[in-house]
């Protein structure tokens, strides 16, 4: 991952060569394990207005299946750091439908992100990409993918939970 100074340099180069609206949303996506508090301050000072963090889940066993290196707490800390740095928009991405994720795991993940200073939450159904360790484990029968009813339940839970807290579905 490029350090903030290089990202800001790229943004400056783009602005020098192309018209960029003053109110343009400039987004950086990041994984929680790859950022520190000063990272967000540097990006905000350089003109980035939105940070999207790949939180995925508050369940350690789900993060392990997804081969994620951050702890649930680290993901929540990263959202707080971005907000404290004054980043205008902070978003967390969740993934549902991971093998071994229960409905209670999913509800706890939603509860966790609802208590953070974010203004957007994305909830995506897991897509297992060929060539990944997860795809191999599923193909070998080591992990079972959830059925369509489980996925539908998790979608509905997220939709109702997030809407009740002012997050609006737009996709």
Which residues does each predicted region cover?
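C-terminal scaffold of the Radical SAM
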Residues: 1-171
């Amino acid at each position: 991952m490029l350090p903030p100074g290089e990202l800001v340099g790229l943004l400056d180069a783009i602005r020098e060569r192309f018209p960029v609206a003053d109110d343009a949303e400039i987004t950086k996506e990041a994984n929680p394990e790859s950022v520190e508090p000063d990272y967000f301050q540097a990006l905000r000072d350089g003109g980035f207005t939105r940070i999207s963090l790949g939180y995925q889940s508050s369940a350690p066993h789900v993060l392990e299946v997804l081969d994620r290196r951050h702890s649930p707490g680290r993901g929540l800390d990263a959202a707080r750091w971005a907000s404290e740095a004054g980043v205008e928009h902070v978003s967390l991405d969740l993934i549902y439908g991971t093998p071994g994720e229960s409905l209670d795991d999913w509800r706890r993940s939603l509860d966790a992100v609802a208590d953070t200073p974010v203004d957007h939450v994305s909830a995506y159904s897991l897509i297992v990409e060929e060539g990944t360790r997860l795809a191999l484990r599923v193909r070998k029968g080591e992990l079972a993918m959830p059925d369509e009813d489980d996925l539908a339940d998790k979608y509905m839970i997220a939709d109702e939970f997030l809407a009740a807290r002012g997050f609006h579905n737009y996709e």
